[in-house]
Structure formats: C-alpha cells, structure tokens
Amino acid sequence: MELKLTKYTAGVVQTNIYFLKNTETGECVILDPGANASKIIEIAEKQLKAQPVAVLLTHGHFDHIMAAREVAEHFGVKIYALEAERELLGDPQMNLSASFGMEICITKFVPVQDGEHLDFLDLDWQVIATPGHTGGSCCYYIGKTGAEPILFSGDTLFRESYGRTDFPTGSERLLLAGIQGKLLVLPENTKVYPGHEGETTIENEKKYNPAAFLGRLC
C-alpha cells in the first residue's frame, strides 16, 4: 500500500489541514478542515483526484472545524469526533468562534471513544483520547502504514511544545499526563503531524519536549 499525505495550512491561526490518501484505492481522509472549504474541496478533487470517505476532528475549536460541515456535506461523508467534545462543538462561546464574530457549531457527528479502532483507507486508526487542550481532544494513530507509524496530534502535541490549556474545558494536568502516558510511549519512529507548525517524531519529543519532563511532576 502506498499512502500520500498532503498538508494545507489555512485560517486566521494557520491551522494544518491534512489529507491522507490511499493511492491504490483513491480514497482519502480529511483531518481538521478548519477554514476555506472551497479550497479543501479543490485539493481533494483536482489536486489529489481523491474520494474522501470521512472527516476526522481532533478537537472542537473553531479553527479546526470551520469548514467541516460544508466539506462533509459536499462529499456525502460523516464527521467523527470524540463524544466528550460534544458540548464544546455545539457552543460558539466554548469553541471560541464567538470571539471572532462567528457562530460555528457542529451537532451532527459520529461519536468515538478512547481506544476505539476505525477502518478507513484499509488502515487501522486508533482513537487516543488526550484531554487537556480541551476536554474532548483526541489523537489518531496508525500503527501499520507500510512505513513509519503516523500520529495526528491536533493541538495536544507540537514540535517541542504542547497545547494551551487556558481555554474552556482545558487542563494542563490532564494534557501533560496524556502526552507522557499515551503519546510518548508510542514507537520512537512515529511521525507526528500536529495541528500547527511542522511535523516531528516521538523520538524527538521524548528528548526535547518540555511535556516529557513536566508530566512527571504532575
């Protein structure tokens, strides 16, 4: 199997939107479509010539969900998010869209749970709940790709940094515990694709991410 990963960065806070395509089947998954639905659709249809089969959300902040409904409706696919994020997804104040003069909410989605396995692109996607940035934040881990494992970490784990916890439902204690106990125990060659800025590896984060050390104090 050959996979093609495409990143498109958009929106007021430069959110990374990911497309993972199985080049053999032509299917793709779109993660965190946070802005510019028309461009996301164009990338999938014209640039990648792919057929999206799902929209996955790592959490419910507006900069990760703003284009989700339009993209999902256009392709006739479902949105997936952690059940624990339901309240935040449906509340413009909590998901911060109201702070930018918008009222964005998502009430229709397929709820997933910690440890659940999803089957897309002939791959096993493991849902890893990582509350902290928000109460219903999660990551998606693909252990068997034919190459290095992949982790889509949302705003939980960044390159040598980690997500803010001063927004509604945030908790630094939970965030650090989740990073150390669930993410940094993954294989060191795992490629990490975060919600903002550049990619990294678990090996790098075990060495240089402050969360690797702060978590031991919580």
Q: What residue ranges belong to the model's regions?
A:
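Conserved beta-strand hairpin/beta-sheet module of binuclear metal-dependent hydrolase folds
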Residues: E2-L48, C139-S153
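Short Gly/Pro-enriched turn/cap motifs at secondary-structure boundaries
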Residues: Y8-T9, T107-F109, A129-H133
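Conserved S/T- and glycine-rich ATP-binding loop of Class I adenylate-forming
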Residues: L20, T58, T130
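Short, glycine/acidic-enriched loop or turn micro-motifs at the edges of active sites
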Residues: E24-T25, A35, F62, G136, ...
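Active-site HxH/HxHxD metal-binding segment of metal-dependent hydrolases
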Residues: C28, A35-D124, E148-P149, K207-L217
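Metallo-beta-lactamase
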Residues: D124-A129, T134-C218
